């Protein structure tokens, strides 16, 4: 079983390619440990903090572990409609953070996420969710134009905006990646270059380098594995 540890944020600044190596090494060790302790089905580990809760079963109190989940949220998509966590019910999905005028890692990230979109396009069990961290500039119209430029005209890949504080909050405290203002960074913000894989129960099952082909190859392989798991 996985040890009771909080998922360390993957910290990638808006400078290609400055990474918090200690965080990456810790995460790799954590994943290696949990994978090694997984069951014979070789399921992906559930990442994040676990909380012990007491409940009554057959008249007896037992202690159970509750895994970290992505909570509900309320954002607006490139189509102008409200998007909540319910839109992702019974889906596995990949989440990331970006902004349309990003001068550094975002173009690499979107090139790689487009590969994921193309591979799983039309699969009703898969969605992609990209959060802008510059909502003042990235209006619904801007996001729609950006999505169209990538060849995205359906609802399988949603680009969402909302109050800046809500986006930063869900990034740092729910997906546990960096998303914040930083006037010393290009564009005035700093965010993670990670892609976060979330299962149908809203658990985080993997964190991947979204700026490299190798990282995204691993993501897509794990998505296939997670789809098989959810169908078994």
Go through the PLM ranges and name each one.
Residues 125-139, 155-165:
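Thiol-based oxidoreductase modules, predominantly thioredoxin-like and allied folds used
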Residues 181-232:
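Thiol-/selenol-based redox modules, centered on thioredoxin-like
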Residues 144-192:
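Short, internal strand/loop/helix patches
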């Amino acid at each position: 079983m996985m040890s009771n540890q909080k998922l360390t944020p993957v910290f990638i600044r808006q400078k290609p390619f400055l990474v918090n190596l200690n965080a990456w090494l810790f995460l790799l060790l954590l994943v290696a440990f949990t994978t090694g302790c997984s069951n014979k089905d070789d399921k992906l580990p559930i990442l994040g903090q676990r909380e012990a809760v007491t409940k009554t079963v057959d008249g007896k109190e037992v202690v159970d572990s509750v895994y970290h989940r992505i909570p509900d949220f309320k954002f607006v998509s490139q189509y102008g409609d409200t998007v909540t966590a319910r839109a992702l019910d019974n889906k596995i999905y990949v989440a990331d953070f970006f902004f349309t005028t990003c001068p550094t890692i975002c173009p690499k990230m979107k090139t790689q996420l487009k590969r994921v979109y193309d591979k799983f396009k039309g699969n009703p069990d898969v969605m992609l969710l990209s959060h802008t961290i510059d909502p003042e500039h990235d209006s619904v119209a801007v996001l729609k134009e950006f999505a169209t430029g990538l060849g995205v005209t359906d609802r399988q890949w949603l680009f969402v905006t909302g109050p800046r504080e809500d986006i930063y909050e869900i990034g740092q405290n729910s997906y546990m990646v960096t998303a914040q203002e930083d006037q010393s960074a290009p564009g005035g913000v700093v965010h993670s270059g990670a892609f976060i894989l979330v299962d149908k129960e809203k658990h985080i099952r993997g964190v991947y380098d979204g700026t490299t082909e190798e990282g995204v190859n691993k993501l897509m392989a794990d998505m296939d594995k997670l789809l098989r798991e959810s169908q078994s």
